Amino acid sequence: MAEGGFDPCECVCSHEHAMRRLINLLRQSQSYCTDTECLQELPGPSSDNGISITMILMAWMVIAVILFLLRPPNLRGSNLTGKPASPHNGQDPPAPPVD
């Protein structure tokens, strides 16, 4: 707790507020369900309508493939400028001198 008995966390999330949310949640669920059965669908997101997580992942994959194909030439790894890939033109480096 801070000085003077003031707790800044109490402004954001108080125990009373959490208990009110819990009680409201219980009251709402009691209007939909009894002890033995639920009379109708509970409110919430429906899996039949809207965009599913699979569609979102497929969209990201398509975007990734498009960005991969449209990347700039310097990131493609191909040697288009005619420069050698290694300082020894693909040959083994010379052996160090023996003393």
Swiss-Prot record:
All ranges on the Lumenal side of the membrane: 1-49
Cell cycle keyword on record: no
Cellular localization per UniProt: Endoplasmic reticulum membrane
Gene Ontology biological process terms, A to Z: blastocyst hatching
The keyword Cytoplasm appears for this protein: no
Region Disordered: start-end pairs: 78-99
Signal peptide (from-to): none
Membrane topology: Single-pass membrane protein
Regions that span the bilayer: 50-70
PANTHER family: SMALL INTEGRAL MEMBRANE PROTEIN 14 (PTHR31019:SF1)
Protein name per Swiss-Prot or TrEMBL: Small integral membrane protein 14
Species annotation: Bos taurus
